[in-house]
Amino acid sequence: MMNDNIATPFAKPLYVMLKPAGAHCNLACKYCYYLEKNHLYQNTPRHLMTDEMLEQFTREYIEAQTMPQVLFTWHGGEPLMRSIDFYRKALALQKKYAHGKQIDNVIQTNGTLLTDEWCEFFAQNHWLVGISIDGPQEYHDHYRVTPAGKPSWEKVMQGISLLKKHRVEWNAMAVVNAYNAEHPLEFYHFFRDNGCQYLQFTPIVERLTEHEDGRTLASLADNREIPLADASVTPQQWGNFLCTIFDDWVRHDVGKTFVEIFDCTLANWMGVLPGICAYSKECGHAGVMEHNGDVYSCDHFVFPEYKLGNIRDQSLIDMLYGEKQQAFSRLKHTSLPRQCKECDMEFACHGECPKNRFEKDKYGEPGLNYLCQGYYQYYSHVAPYMDFMKRELLAQRPPANIMNVLKNN
């Protein structure tokens, strides 16, 4: 059990992503990597976090923090399939166990279930809302559909309008796939023109296999040659996509529109932690807890072989600071193949997410990122711009000055 005298190994934030409704969702996006996690809990009729589980997690999670700020991240599936009363209960528990710490909440939703009531709740309690939307209607509706195959874009846009109406802070997470990657500027301008100031791109890279329990996606531990899902973006598409958007952003939107990968690139150029595990030297600092208390190494590693335990039997500290998770964290760097170790852009990329590192490098060593070619194209392309922005920051000048320089050249 946790107590006031417990000591964490080091002073840094502890992050756990919560799945209060498990993998349940009102959409059936064709590329979704999480829907099939329901197969892991086939013997559980209702994948809903109990009030008892919510309270135990809230207490332990806050007590485990060594920093004055605590971030609760609600994810899915679709977390709005839980009622507002569930989240009101969550807020009451956070207040009960806060003990002077600052509590923040962020929720990631597909946006289709947003109502005035939800948006009033988010506004009153200062929640950040992440919206999953894949750009203009044609690209979004290509993959993001209902279980009946119906489009979802119009409902998402209605949800965004409600967020704006109630002045809820929101950002966007956009999946880049084989279809929309061919239209980078139209894709980027859609978000910018809709007032989205913070934008995250997530490239789809999934391999298809078969498991006895019905799951079809491969984990990193499955090192056989496995075909890619049709929605997967190619390395060439990914590189061209990033370079094309960057060229537009660096001339018009620096300091106005914040694109996660561009921010992370500049952070690594400066030699500071980028804040996103994929572009950090090590990962494993952001676990995930399912509805029943099962804790896994990462949201992209919810596979039996990466299960750390259950909160009913072990503390969060024991699981997330334990040797199994520490080994998982170190492996991101120690498992890099020779080609990565020799690469002049390794400091910026750090091999990206381990889930995508299933190729062999030019020396025949395993562990090369499938998207390596695209990332190298991007980092090589942005290098002179990053060098300039780094110099501006070191001189305590805004990196947005680069827009004036490019305008005058």
What are these regions (language model features)?
Residues 1-11, 189:
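Long, charge-rich, low-complexity alpha-helical segments
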Residues 10-52:
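Canonical Radical SAM [4Fe-4S] cluster-binding loop centered on the CxxxCxxC motif
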Residues 16-19, 71-77, 104-109, 259-261:
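Extended hydrophobic secondary-structure segments that form protein cores and membrane-embedded regions
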Residues 21-28, 78-81, 283, 340-342, ...:
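Cysteine-centered iron-sulfur cluster-binding motifs in ferredoxin-type domains/subunits
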Residues 58-73, 82-220:
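Radical SAM/AdoMet-radical enzyme domain recognition
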Residues 146-154, 161, 165-278, 282, ...:
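Radical SAM enzyme [4Fe-4S]-AdoMet core and its adjacent flexible, acidic
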Residues 302-409:
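Flexible mid-to-C-terminal extensions adjoining Fe-S/redox cofactors in radical SAM and related proteins
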